[in-house]
Design a protein with these regions (language model features):
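Serine residues within intrinsically disordered or low-complexity segments
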Residues: 13-14, 33
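Non-heme di-metal
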Residues: 26-207
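Short, low-complexity, intrinsically disordered N-terminal modules
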Residues: 1-3, 21
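Cysteine-centered motifs
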Residues: 3, 15-16
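Polybasic, lysine-rich low-complexity intrinsically disordered segments
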Residues: 7-9
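Short, positively charged and aromatic/hydrophobic N-terminal segments
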Residues: 11, 18-26
Length: 207
């Protein structure tokens, strides 16, 4: 698919030290011939429905804060509808695979975001005299890089069958009831609530 890119100015405001990014510097415009393909139409629909879902979720929070519970509920309900629509178009794009395939897809997307997208946006913002916005792009890029690292570790775990089995005794916790088991492998079933092994994860204390 061929794309042309059109630059626009980057504007930002700050409040209490928080940078508000009001515009991303590039806007893709598809060739007219590409607009007529089913795949491109599905991509446009998926992007639009995904954006609407997030937007309505944000709107619902504002409505709750302002005391409009019914309006918040309507925004939330519509957001769920948009999520269902997005899934429809994403499936049409063959975007959902096995867990291992999905992890590889996610890692690839995160790599693009930090290595190319945010890095490029940061350079452009710096060149155009917006050091604060450049720093914001760089910081978000660092987060996306950590996301890629996490996905790659999970890919490695799945590839060598160490999701539920380790080389030495570790502590496993049931995500359903909180039972903690010690061993090289997670229990096939939780001895307390009987949930399957898939509910176990390594204990991670961050307090």
């Amino acid at each position: 698919m061929h794309c042309r890119f059109k630059k626009k100015k980057v504007y930002f405001s700050s409040c209490c030290g928080t940078i508000l990014i009001t515009y991303i510097t590039k806007e893709a415009r598809y060739e007219q011939s590409d607009r007529n393909t089913d795949r491109t139409k599905s991509q446009i629909c998926f992007s639009g429905e995904s954006e609407a879902r997030n937007k309505y979720t944000f709107f619902a929070k504002v409505a709750k804060q302002e005391g409009y519970e019914q309006i918040a509920a309507i925004f939330e309900e519509t957001a769920l509808n948009e999520k269902a629509h997005a899934k429809l178009w994403f499936e049409a794009l063959s975007g959902i695979g096995s867990t291992l395939e999905n992890l590889k897809n996610a890692a690839s997307g995160e790599n693009y975001e930090w290595a190319e997208m945010y890095a490029g946006f940061a350079r452009t913002a710096a060149q155009e005299g917006f050091p604060d916005i450049a720093a914001a792009f760089e910081k978000v890029g660092e987060i996306e890089r950590s996301h890629e690292d996490r996905y790659n570790q999970l890919i490695d775990n799945m590839s060598v069958n160490t999701v539920f089995a380790k080389d030495s005794d570790v502590r496993w916790i049931c995500r359903n009831c909180g039972h903690i088991s010690v061993g090289a492998e997670a229990p096939l079933n939780c001895p307390v609530c009987s949930h399957p092994q898939s509910y176990f994860e390594l204990v991670s204390e961050n307090y």
